[in-house]
Design a protein with these regions (language model features):
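Carbohydrate-interacting regions of secretory-pathway proteins
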Residues: 19-235
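Sec-dependent N-terminal signal peptides
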Residues: 4-13
Length: 235
């Protein structure tokens, strides 16, 4: 009888895990941008062999390929491969207003955000440089700047040192992001990166950034790639 009960419990546990795994969904269908829309600048986004390719163009601001659906609490995993001359990132819990809007940043501070300006938390993709390698850090795009390392903790020099050791130059790198309530955590290739609490924005879209390059002609055509974008909403 004990054996049967144990088998039943094990079976139920396995079913529970299977159900949890089924909740994870691919954000990208591998063929086209169904369910996505481009915001901000006019950098070129294409699909090649199941990979999203973002290509830098001159004279345009930061560009973002964004999910149409908004997400609050979730675990997001993806891989990226970036030209080491480029800065990029992935927006989470981000938004864009239809008109100029003044937002309360807390501590008596406000900021006017222009209509059409993508803003919100960004998981950084940094060039691999010994003086600053903050991939996996969190930058508050269009609002407060660096949060981690920065306003919410993290030693900049130590963060860079760990980043240089963890990052794989010229190869696919894996990122995991966990947003739960006011907690935001990230991992780069399995190594913990950002870990802090912030409650300014609870929900928003996911966005893939191609950073503006201004008039730097040598960066025209430089690319950043993403694949295997999988998200599991948390309840």
């Amino acid at each position: 009888m004990k054996t049967l009960i144990l088998l039943a419990i094990t079976s139920l546990f396995s079913l529970s895990l299977t159900a949890a795994e089924k909740e994870a969904v691919a954000l990208f269908n591998g063929k086209d941008f169904t369910g996505w829309t481009q915001k901000g600048g006019v950098a070129k986004y294409t699909v090649k062999d199941g990979v999203i390719v973002g290509t830098a163009v001159a004279g345009t601001p930061n560009s973002f390929m964004c999910t149409e659906k908004l997400y609050g609490d979730f675990v997001l995993e993806y891989e990226y491969l970036c030209d080491n001359r480029l800065n990029s990132g992935v927006q989470i819990r981000s938004n864009m207003f239809a008109k100029d809007t003044t937002v309360d940043l807390g501590n008596g501070k406000t900021r006017k955000i222009a209509k059409g300006r993508v803003h919100g938390y960004q998981v950084e993709i940094d060039p691999n440089k010994p003086d600053r390698m903050w991939s996996g850090g969190i930058y508050d795009e269009g609002r407060r700047g660096w949060l981690f390392p920065g306003q919410h903790g993290g030693d900049a020099a130590r963060f860079t040192a760990t980043g240089v050791k963890t990052y794989k130059p010229g190869k696919w790198n894996t990122v995991r992001v966990e947003c739960r309530g006011d907690s935001i955590k990230t991992w780069l290739n399995g190594v913990p990166r950002a870990d802090f609490k912030d409650s300014l924005t609870a929900k928003g879209f996911i966005g893939l950034q191609v950073h503006g390059i201004g008039g730097k002609k040598e960066l025209v055509g430089a690319q950043v790639r993403w694949r295997n974008l999988v998200l599991k909403e948390l309840k």
